Amino acid sequence: MDSLSKKIQNLGIHDIRNAARFAQNVIVQYEPYQIDIRRATNTDAWGPTPKHLAKVLRNRYQVPLYLMTEYTLKRLVDHIATRPKNLYEKARKDYVNYGSEWRVVLKCLVVIEFLLLNVDTGDELNQIRSCLLTHKHILTREIAQFKVKFSNDGKMEIHERGIRKKGELILQYLEDSQFLKKERAKNKKNALKIRQQGESSIYNANQISTSASYDNIDDDEFDADADGFDSEMDANNVTNFNVPVETEANSNTRRRSHMEEQRRQRREILREQIKNKEQQRKRKQQQDSIPDLIDLDDSTSTTNNITIDNGNNDNKNNNINSNSDDDDDEFGDFQSETSPDTTAPKTSNSKIDDLLDWDGPKSDTDTTAAAQTSLPFAEKKQQKARPQATKDKSKGNDAFSDLFSYSKSLV
């Protein structure tokens, strides 16, 4: 549903016109050749394209060419007429195709010229010429007096001159058979050039176009040679115009030669690429097999550096261990020096507690034994270094003198 809505939103005026034309073709039930002619002579700003003209020409095998020419002239007259025949024609002129009528007229003349220049010589060309001669008054009077009342681009006079010039050219084709033969031969030559250039671009895009080899003279020489040719020459025989007549076998042979040449070139390029890749692979293998002395020196130097670094690391570890041992010793000395400050108040407190014990002081032997068992080794050493007065408590029973002497020893 969303895709349908998007398509409806993206519709333009050209899509709406195409839908209306399709509905009109279905309702009116036009013949296939009429539909092709209507498509080639519509009111679009472009065309008729070569595709449209080719579709018109292919109907010659199903429909006589004079019917196709008559229908083209009928469509031309319908858009030239200033007085509409019915209400439908009036609505079409005043609203639908207003400002674009001249395009239909010019395209009808282009289709007629295309039929004159591209049909086969003989009965087909005679049918078109007889039909145009029958309705010659359309070209002499209606086309010569045609006026463009309004144009969408505002170039009415330019379009009028173009339509009149095209009508005069068709009249010259009808009146001068030699001029018609010359133009038909020139048109065939140009069509052959276009076809050869298209084939060369498809089958030999990288090479120079070979179309110049088929045409060695320019248009001036062509015109100079064409003015004096025999009037009884058949239009199909174009050898006097230096136009090459190629058969289907020759074109197929040339096409095959182009394809074979391209295949041969591709095979050579592929062989060269494979050869280069093989040579590169062999060079790479040789380079890998030869040892690089520079790389070996680098590797040995790196191993030596690694062993040296390992030795240095071992020495560093030994130094660190020795340093750590020294630090441990210093830390022990520091601990032995600082421990008396922390433990001394405890002994003094115990001494004070003994002094404050009213039940009776404990014996000196008990206190010294308890102190010696509780004190660490560092304090024991320090006690040995104390004065004799503090150690020998049995000589004096004054507690305050012992405390005073102990404090002096600490200071």
From Swiss-Prot:
Biased amino acid composition, Basic and acidic residues: 351-365
Effect on the protein upon substituting residue 334 to A: Reduced binding to GGA2
Modified residues (Phosphoserine): 322, 324, 363, 394, 401
One annotated Gene Ontology cellular component of this protein: endosome
Ranges of Acidic residues composition bias in the record: 216-233
Compositionally biased tracts (Low complexity): 299-323
Record keyword tRNA processing present: no
Annotated region described as Disordered, given as residue ranges: 214-264, 276-400
SMART domains the record matches: ENTH (SM00273)
Modified residues (Phosphothreonine): 368
Biased composition (Polar residues): 234-252, 335-350
Disulfide pairings: none
Residue intervals of the ENTH domain: 25-184
Outcome of substituting residue 331 to A: Reduced binding to GGA2
Miscellaneous comment: Present with 8100 molecules/cell in log phase SD medium.
Self-association and partners: Interacts with the clathrin adapter GGA2 and the clathrin adapter complex AP-1.
Protein name, as recorded: Epsin-5
Name of encoding gene: ENT5
